[in-house]
Amino acid sequence: MDHALLILVFLIGVAVLFDFLNGLHDAANSIATIVATRVLPPVFAVGWAAFFNFIAFLFFGLHVADTIGRGIVDPGIISDKVIFGALMGAIVWNVVTWLAGIPSSSSHALVGGLLGAGVAKAGTGAIVVAGVAKTVAAIFLSPAIGFMLALLLVLLVSWLFVKANPAFADRVFRGLQFLSASAYSLGHGGNDAQKTMGIIAILLYSRGMLGGEFHVPFWVVITCQAAIALGTLFGGWRIVHTMGSRITRLTPQQGFCAETGGAITLFAATSLGVPVSTTHTITGAIVGVGAAKRVSAVRWNVARSIVTAWFVTMPAAAAIGALFYAVGGLFLT
């Protein structure tokens, strides 16, 4: 096999591995609440989430892929070493946080890795400031919006069902959680898989393989959706436990509100091409439903440790990405 083609296949393989680990690491967010409320056992929940992760491309455009491909660093500086550094920065950080059971963001790990590798090659002038600012703003906005929507939904459904028989309300929201979990899984597949699509597409573009115009080939779309769905099937039970029960105890009603608030946030962000974190979004929503009950219902020490991981993720992945950019220079020539 031609050396250049071998390197291309290797880098696409690394990108698909990242997407798989994204499913393993982040897709637990899609099922944490439905598992915590005992509506579905984990083995069925992961299959449910994997299916909706896979079909997400049928519902959304590819705006997030475009942002990742052209809106974080200047496409003109993209090289094999930059892509390798970006992916390894995200993968290494994801593995470390997965082993520790910390729900950090795969999305911002990838952005951090791309920034670190891009700056290592071309300096800070390689940064697309507007795109990075949009992504950083999402760190704060996505959990805040998820929090507010979930809080308002809890207050609304509590008012609507205030006189309902508790057993009846429980049955209703157990059924509704199938819909809300499906919607959240669609949002996750729609936003997160597109980040890998953007990386592969910009790699192909940098090699002149897209006919001079940046776009995402259909085979890239299917490959990335399949990889994230398979990652979901292998699960991430440490993180499910943290997200679903250690932050606050959830009822089916609260689980429905958290998932619905999170799903609305993800749908809006994906439509606008904003690469947001599913971890940030569902955490904000879970905190919102817990706070609606009472502030003390939220285990703030657990939430605080998660927030700390958010702020560490991007710079840590950037440092790792810069390191692997240098490592890539040893064999990616």
Feature locations, PLM:
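Multi-pass alpha-helical transmembrane bundle typical of ion/small-solute transporters
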Residues: M1-T333
